[in-house]
């Protein structure tokens, strides 16, 4: 009888945030990856926000359950709008996703316990908003949780905190920290995959969001309802404030604080995501250029021949070996990278009265993620 060949796990998967669009497209992306020859080689998944949820189910090899869950999911089962009077104290939405996950997929802590035993290590990123001081280092305000080293209960809290869109809901407790959506600090955790010594290939999905403009229609409806009571001084003052907000919106300015929070989050997410890819790309190019330079210098010196040439070549080689710079121990890692918007189909959680999510639209987004990776795998001749 022949021996069973053990496949080395040397592939990392990186998943960005992206709300419901991101989960659905990542689901298709992961389904195609699972059907490929690369899947048995996957040893690590790194996910932020929506990528934390889809990555967790992929690491557990429960993508079919995730698909069923997502096809049933509706906006009010993720983030349910609060009454207007509760906004100043509780945020714009109630975070319903934890209860929905527990009802349909099982206790999240139970999933985290299974995750600790899974052959694929899952790592999620959350943003630390605890009320204490942080250092000014590279990972300030970033919380990173691995299924290999984090207690299951804390890991469960981290997955839900990473997916808690802070423009909508209040932060959550993760162990002894207060945390929220990881997209604020690292929406696309590519650097963590590069830092894993065993990784020889990275397969990544980055969702490119199109942020819908937050209008003032809700404010207009509220103002018209209040205008039936114009003689009451507090109501009259509120009507004037609403008119001012509508005018700000008409000028392209933030009409209210949720609009401001969304705009700030858009800036933070776009900036840290682009920077993440730029640093990875520049590092790979620098490492390749350095290796080429090393070879060229060695060839030039050795072309002189003789003992002197050999002596100088050894001295130069020793100098290269003793050089010290930030990414000396790093190496260029090939990457199969999918980037995409939701296309013509986009499902978002609006601030008020969101439109129901249709199964047809969801299946289209799943197909889009599947087909995008399928095209790239074909180009790379990966079965």
PLM feature spans:
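Patatin-like phospholipase
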Residues: 1-46, 56-383
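Catalytic nucleophile serine of serine hydrolases
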Residues: 49
